[in-house]
């Protein structure tokens, strides 16, 4: 299962080994809450 998180700056995501994709307003699922991304959507993959 993949976890979705929202990021404000791409550099911050890249620093945490995450990939940032710029998309329109998209809804991400963070644990049991729904977070909306404005510009960047970060997709965190399962470790190894």
Swiss-Prot record:
GO aspect biological process, one term = sperm DNA condensation
Superkingdom, natural source: Eukaryota
Query: Subcellular localization, per the record?
Result: Nucleus; Chromosome
**A Pfam cross-reference name:** Protamine_P1
Q: What is its main location?
A: nucleus
Record bears the keyword RNA-binding: no
Gene Ontology annotations for the cellular component aspect, listed alphabetically: nucleosome; nucleus
UniProt keywords, alphabetically: Chromosome, Developmental protein, Differentiation, DNA condensation, DNA-binding, Nucleosome core, Nucleus, Spermatogenesis
InterPro entries (alphabetical): Protamine_P1
> Example GO molecular function term?
DNA binding
Keyword DNA-binding (UniProt): yes
- Tissues in which the UniProt entry reports expression: Testis.
Q: Transmembrane segments in this chain: where?
A: none
Residue ranges the record marks as coiled coil: none
State the function annotated in the UniProt record: Protamines substitute for histones in the chromatin of sperm during the haploid phase of spermatogenesis. They compact sperm DNA into a highly condensed, stable and inactive complex.
> Can you tell me which family this protein belongs to?
Belongs to the protamine P1 family.
What name does the UniProt record give this protein?
Sperm protamine P1
Organism of origin is Eptesicus fuscus (Big brown bat)
Q: Which gene encodes it?
A: PRM1
């Amino acid at each position: 299962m993949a976890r979705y998180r929202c990021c404000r700056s791409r550099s911050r995501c890249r620093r945490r080994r995450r990939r940032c994709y710029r998309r329109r307003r998209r809804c991400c699922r963070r644990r049991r809450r729904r977070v909306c991304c404005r510009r960047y959507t970060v997709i965190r993959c399962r470790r190894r």
